[in-house]
A protein has these predicted regions:
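Anion (oxyanion) recognition and catalysis
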Residues: 104, 108, 237, 278-279
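Conserved PLP-binding catalytic core of the aspartate aminotransferase-like
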Residues: 244-278
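Conserved PLP-enzyme active-site core in the AAT-like
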Residues: 3-169
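Active-site C-terminal subdomain of aminotransferase-like
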Residues: 91, 110, 135-240
Length: 323
């Protein structure tokens, strides 16, 4: 939805009238660490892969603003039109946090729609001490995050915020005679805010969680997960052969075990092997990933029932399977 709105805003809603013909070539920008759903959404919105730009990242795996500006300038020089910038807070592999303020400045300068993909990490916006990670988010055109990923809502539940709902209405509105009623106009008609004509009552799940647990309990659970991640980070730091590949922004750690007996050329296969060994044992579930060209193991601490004793057991399990 965000990219459909971005497409129409960039063309003064011209593609609604004329389809994909007769308009400048539009371009979408995101970091190389952006979720695969960004590419899928762009393709569904009518962009071709040649219209997608994957920007370099910093040493902390956030988008490199200088490289983004370079790509924006190159496209403008080639008579292409910058359409949308996607900010990731945080990225799937490492939970890296893009600089929203910097991206908002570029979006304003180049006339782009700014979409913030807060997916899992967006739940941490309920913590006052973590809100600095989203500085500038009030300047976004749209934001999405998934309460089913960390907040604890039953799957599936995604929240989509848009600055101006009229962009949704302009893109999605339909009003055939068989849908018209005497009450039209008295309240928002959500068939005009999205692709489906009808929708399930997903909001009930979120409402029920908020009523049952309340803000304080939800905040304390997220703080517990972050504290447990910090504890494990400290254990890893005290061992010479364990390494963190990325900063620990919230509750996700990307680790590599580098024993002296394993050659560098064999390290990726070794990493995948001990990750698969733990998963096969049923003692824990970890996720392999590739970060900066290196195979890593992702440890995401965020299940509802996960306590310190479980993380302590995980650490013992990791040591056992790499002994």
């Amino acid at each position: 939805m965000a990219l459909l709105c971005a497409r129409e805003k960039s063309t003064d809603f011209g593609q609604i009238r004329n389809g994909l013909r007769g308009e400048p070539e539009l371009v979408v920008y995101s970091s190389s660490q952006a979720h695969s759903s960004i590419t899928k959404a762009a393709l569904l919105a009518g962009f071709g892969k040649s219209q997608l730009r994957s920007c370099a990242v910093t040493d902390e795996f956030a988008v490199d603003l200088a490289d983004l500006r370079r790509q924006l300038d190159n496209d403008v020089a080639d008579n292409r039109k910058p359409c949308a910038i996607v900010a990731c807070t945080g990225t799937t592999a490492t939970t890296a946090m893009d600089d929203i303020k910097g991206l908002a400045d570029l979006a304003q300068e180049y006339g782009c729609w700014l979409h913030v993909d807060a997916a899992m990490a967006g739940s941490a916006m309920i913590l006052p001490e973590m809100r600095h990670l989203w500085d500038g988010v009030e300047r976004a055109d749209s934001i999405v995050f998934n309460p089913h990923k960390w907040l604890g809502v039953v799957f599936d539940c995604s929240i989509y915020y848009v600055r101006d709902e009229q962009h949704l209405v302009r893109v999605m509105s339909t009003n055939p005679s068989y849908l018209q009623t005497s009450a039209d106009g008295e309240a928002p008609n959500y068939r005009d805010w999205g692709i489906p004509l009808g929708r399930r009552f997903r909001a009930m799940k979120l409402w029920w969680l908020l009523r049952c647990e309340g803000a304080d309990k939800l905040q304390n659970r997220l703080r517990r997960d972050i504290e447990n991640a910090r504890w494990l980070e400290q254990q890893l730091a005290e061992q010479a052969d364990w390494h963190l590949i990325a900063p620990v922004a919230l509750q996700t750690l990307c680790v590599v075990h580098r024993p002296a007996a394993i050659a560098e050329s064999e390290l990726d296969a070794y990493t995948q092997a001990w990750c698969e060994s733990i998963n096969a044992s049923g003692e824990a579930m970890l996720t392999p990933a590739v970060v900066g060209g290196t195979s890593v193991v992702r440890i995401s601490i965020g299940a509802l029932a996960t306590e310190r004793r479980h993380v302590e057991q995980l650490w013992r399990t990791m040591q056992k399977h790499t002994a």
